[in-house]
A protein has these predicted regions:
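Generic secondary-structure signature for well-ordered alpha-helical cores
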Residues: 12, 96, 100, 129-133
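Short glycine-enriched loop/turn motifs at secondary-structure junctions
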Residues: 23-24, 74-76
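Short capping loops/turns at secondary-structure boundaries
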Residues: 59, 73, 80-88, 110-113, ...
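Long, compositionally biased
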Residues: 19, 107-148
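Hydrophobic/aromatic-rich, well-ordered segments within soluble, folded domains that form packed cores
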Residues: 77-103
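A glycine-rich, hydrophobic loop/mini-helix early in the fold
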Residues: 1-60
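Helix-hairpin-helix/helix-loop-helix acidic hairpins
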Residues: 60-74
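Short linear loop/turn motifs
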Residues: 25-26, 64-66, 95-98, 105-112
Length: 148
């Protein structure tokens, strides 16, 4: 069993899915997510409308569409931000402004609500630090993933 398959199996028991999206410059793009949380995130009418406008017509095949966009788009498909739980307004603004004119940057480029964005960036940074420290101490991926 490959390392990725073993990781996917271990995470599956915790309600976490692993999807191989495609090859990128230096390796592979892997999307790790909780299906119920992704469905809730993408359920808003505004998000569904945005994804439809970007060519995501079949809700049950959105990850396959994202995978196809990664293969065929000469530039990175920036709508991936909604799959990563970036604010929809920031994803749209990033596309509209071609990545320029943002008010602050961290995990993503924020175009509105800089205080909220910076708070989220700090939370993500702290979470990453804690999890990396636990991993370095020998905790397995399956132990690090909490059941939802």
């Amino acid at each position: 069993m490959s390392g990725l398959a073993a990781c996917a199996k271990a995470l599956s028991a915790r309600g976490v899915k692993v999807a191989l999206l495609g090859k990128c410059n230096s390796g592979w793009l892997i999307y790790v997510y909780r299906p119920a949380m992704l469905a809730a995130r993408l359920a808003s009418p505004d998000t569904r409308g945005f994804l439809r406008s970007m060519g995501y017509t079949n809700q049950s095949a959105w990850l396959e569409t994202l995978r196809a966009h990664l293969k065929t788009n000469p530039t990175f498909p920036h709508e991936i931000g909604v799959f990563l739980d970036y604010p929809l307004s920031d994803v749209k603004a990033f596309i509209e402004h071609a990545g320029a004119d943002y008010c602050c940057a961290g995990i993503w480029k924020a175009y509105s609500n800089p205080i909220s964005a910076q708070r989220t960036f700090a939370l993500y940074r702290k979470c990453r630090e804690v999890y990396m420290a636990c991993y370095r101490r020998g905790l397995s991926i399956s132990r690090l993933a909490v059941a939802a």
